[in-house]
C-alpha cells in the first residue's frame, strides 16, 4: 500500500537551506504531520513508513491515480487557496485487475523507454538504501557500547570508587552478597578440614607401610640411616686413626640394644651432641675413615640394653655435646611408637598458626572481591543508564535513517519465499517464547541480577520467566495476524502448517 503526496506550490521548499521549511504537509489518512518535508519539488511516495521520491519516467509516476485535494482543518491557517496540498491516495478499481495494467505498462516501458537509465537509477537508489541501513545499524549498536565503555572506565568508576571507599563503611552492597561471602568461606573451611584429614591419613599410612626399621643406627628426618657401631650386640674393633686423643668409656651389654627409629622428634632444633659416631663423615664396617678431630668428651655408660639404661641414654644424649656434629632432628621411639607429647603439641601449635594465617588470607581475599563487586554493580547501573539515554537520543535524531533501515529490512524480508519467511519467524518465536526458552530466560535474569547487584530470588526469576514470554507470545501473534496476514497470507498459511 502506497500513499503519495504532491506539492502544487514548490516555493515552500528552500533548496539552499533544506533544514528550513515553511509548509508542513500531511501524509496518510490520519493526517500525521511530518517534522520537515523532504527538500524536493518532485512527487514522493510513502512505503512502510518511509518517504521516497518518485523518479521521472518510472512506473509509479506514470500510473493513473486519483487526486483528492484536502486541507487540514487543524492547520488551515498555514495555507491559502493557492497553497493546497494534493494527496494521491489509491488507484480506482476498474473492470480489470490493477496487476494487468501494471504488467502492460512495464512491458511498454521496456520497449519504448530508456531502460538503461531507469535500471541505473534503481540500482543507485537501492545502493543508497543499503549503505544507509548499514550505517544506521552500526551507529545504533556501537555508539551506546562505546559510551558505556568510556563512561564506565573513565567517569563513573573512579567517582564510585572514591565515594564507596572513603565515605561508605560497608563492604557488601546488600545482605545477599554477604551471605554469598559467608557460604564461600564455609566451603573453604570444609576444604581445609578435608585436606588436613587426608594429610594425616597419608602420614599414618606412610609409617605403617614403611620398611622394617634397621637396628644399630640413627634415622634422620629425610630418611637417611646412619649406622652406629656402638649399638651392636657385640663390640667392633675401632680403628686407632678414627679419633685423636679421645678417652671413650662405653659399656655395652649383650641384651638387645637401644634402637633409634624414625617417628619421634626428640630435638626441636639443631643441637651439638657429644656423640662422635654421629659425625657425617664417619665410616664404618671396616671401611676407611677419614681423620676427624673432636674436642674432649667424656662418655660413661651412654647406652644400655635395659629400660633404665635407655632412659639414661636419652638424658645423656641431650646433655652431652659434640664439636662439629650437626644433627638434624634425631628421632627416638616412644613407648607406643608415636611422638612425644611435648613435640606433638609444638607441631600442632605451628599447624594451627599456619591454618589461621590461611583463613586470614582467604577472608581478606573475599572482602576485597566483594568490595570490588559492589563498586562494579553501582558502576554498571549508571553506565548503562547513560547508554540508554544515548540510545534514545539516537532514535530521535536518526528518525529518517531508521525509517529507511526499516523499509529496507522489510523489503528484504518480503523478498524471501514463503517457506523461508515461515522458518525465520518460527526460529525467532521458538527462541524467545518456545518450550525450551525458559532456561534461556533464567540465565538472562540471573545475569541481570548479578550485573546490577540485585538480590537474587528464585521466586522472582520464576515469576518473570512465567509472565514475560507469555506477553511476547501474545505480541508475536498480534503482529502475525494484524500485519503479516495482510501483506503475505501465504506466509501465514505456511507458518501455521509448519506449527501443526
Curated annotation (Swiss-Prot):
It catalyses: K(+)(in) + H(+)(out) = K(+)(out) + H(+)(in). Pfam families: CemA. The gene is cemA. It is a multi-pass membrane protein. The chain crosses the membrane at residues 129-149, 378-398, 425-445, 461-481. One of its GO terms (cellular component) is chloroplast inner membrane. This is Potassium/proton antiporter CemA. HAMAP family: CemA_PxcA. Belongs to the CemA family. Residues 204-354 are annotated as: Insert. GO terms for molecular function: antiporter activity; proton transmembrane transporter activity. It comes from Chlamydomonas reinhardtii. InterPro entries: CemA (IPR004282). PANTHER family: CHLOROPLAST ENVELOPE MEMBRANE PROTEIN, CHLOROPLAST ENVELOPE MEMBRANE PROTEIN-RELATED. It is found in: Plastid, Chloroplast inner membrane. Coiled coil: none annotated. Keywords: Antiport, Chloroplast, Hydrogen ion transport, Ion transport, Membrane, Plastid, Plastid inner membrane, Potassium, Potassium transport, Transmembrane, Transmembrane helix, Transport. The keyword Transmembrane applies. Contributes to K(+)/H(+) antiport activity by supporting proton efflux to control proton extrusion and homeostasis in chloroplasts in a light-dependent manner to modulate photosynthesis. Prevents excessive induction of non-photochemical quenching (NPQ) under continuous-light conditions. Indirectly promotes efficient inorganic carbon uptake into chloroplasts.
Amino acid at each position: 500500500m502506497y500513499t503519495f503526496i504532491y506539492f502544487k506550490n514548490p516555493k515552500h521548499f528552500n533548496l539552499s537551506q533544506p533544514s528550513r521549511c515553511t509548509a508542513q504537509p500531511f501524509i496518510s489518512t490520519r493526517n500525521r504531520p511530518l517534522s520537515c518535508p523532504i527538500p524536493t519539488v518532485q512527487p514522493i511516495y510513502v512505503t512502510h513508513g518511509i518517504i521516497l521520491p518518485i523518479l521521472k519516467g518510472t512506473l509509479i509516476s506514470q500510473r493513473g491515480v486519483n487526486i483528492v485535494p484536502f486541507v487540514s482543518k487543524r492547520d488551515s491557517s498555514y495555507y491559502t487557496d493557492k497553497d493546497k496540498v494534493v494527496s494521491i491516495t489509491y488507484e480506482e478499481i476498474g473492470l480489470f485487475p490493477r496487476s494487468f495494467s501494471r504488467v502492460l505498462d512495464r512491458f511498454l516501458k521496456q520497449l519504448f523507454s530508456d531502460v538503461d537509465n531507469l535500471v541505473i537509477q534503481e540500482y543507485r537508489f537501492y545502493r543508497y538504501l543499503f549503505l544507509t541501513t548499514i550505517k544506521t545499524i552500526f551507529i545504533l549498536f556501537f555508539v551506546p557500547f562505546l559510551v558505556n565503555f568510556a563512561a564506565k572506565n573513565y567517569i563513573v568508576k573512579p567517582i564510585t570508587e572514591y565515594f564507596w571507599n572513603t565515605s561508605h563503611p560497608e563492604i557488601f552492597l546488600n545482605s545477599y552478597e554477604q551471605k554469598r561471602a559467608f557460604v564461600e568461606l564455609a566451603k573453604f573451611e570444609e576444604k581445609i578440614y578435608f585436606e588436613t584429614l587426608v594429610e594425616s591419613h597419608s602420614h599414618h599410612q606412610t609409617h605403617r607401610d614403611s620398611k622394617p626399621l634397621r637396628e644399630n643406627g640413627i634415622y634422620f628426618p629425610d630418611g637417611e640411616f646412619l649406622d652406629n657401631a656402638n649399638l651392636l650386640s657385640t663390640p667392633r674393633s675401632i680403628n686407632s686413626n678414627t679419633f685423636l686423643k679421645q678417652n671413650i668409656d662405653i659399656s655395652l651389654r649383650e641384651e638387645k640394644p637401644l634402637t633409634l627409629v624414625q617417628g619421634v622428634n626428640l630435638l626441636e632444633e639443631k643441637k651439638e651432641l657429644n656423640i662422635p659416631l654421629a659425625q657425617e663423615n664417619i665410616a664404618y664396617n671396616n671401611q676407611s675413615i677419614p681423620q676427624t678431630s673432636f674436642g674432649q668428651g667424656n662418655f660413661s655408660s651412654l647406652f644400655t640394653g635395659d629400660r633404665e639404661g635407655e632412659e639414661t641414654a636419652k638424658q645423656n644424649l641431650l646433655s652431652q655435646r659434640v664439636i662439629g656434629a650437626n644433627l638434624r632432628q634425631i628421632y627416638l621411639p616412644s613407648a607406643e611408637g608415636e611422638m612425644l607429647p611435648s613435640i606433638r603439641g609444638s607441631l600442632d601449635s605451628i599447624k594451627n598458626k599456619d591454618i589461621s594465617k590461611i583463613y586470614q588470607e582467604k577472608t581478606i581475599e573475599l572482602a576485597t572481591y566483594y568490595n570490588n563487586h559492589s563498586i562494579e554493580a553501582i558502576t554498571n547501573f549508571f553506565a548503562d543508564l547513560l547508554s540508554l539515554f544515548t540510545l534514545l537520543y539516537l532514535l530521535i535524531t536518526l528518525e529518517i535513517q531508521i525509517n529507511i533501515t526499516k523499509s529496507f529490512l522489510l523489503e528484504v524480508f518480503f523478498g524471501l519465499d514463503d517457506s523461508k519467511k515461515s522458518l525465520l519467524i518460527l526460529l525467532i518465536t521458538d527462541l524467545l517464547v518456545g518450550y525450551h526458552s525458559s532456561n534461556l530466560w533464567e540465565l538472562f535474569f540471573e545475569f541481570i541480577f548479578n550485573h546490577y547487584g540485585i538480590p537474587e530470588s528464585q521466586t522472582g526469576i520464576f515469576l518473570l520467566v512465567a509472565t514475560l514470554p507469555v506477553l511476547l507470545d501474545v505480541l508475536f501473534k498480534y503482529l502475525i495476524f494484524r500485519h503479516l496476514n495482510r501483506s503475505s497470507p501465504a506466509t501465514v498459511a505456511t507458518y501455521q502448517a509448519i506449527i501443526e
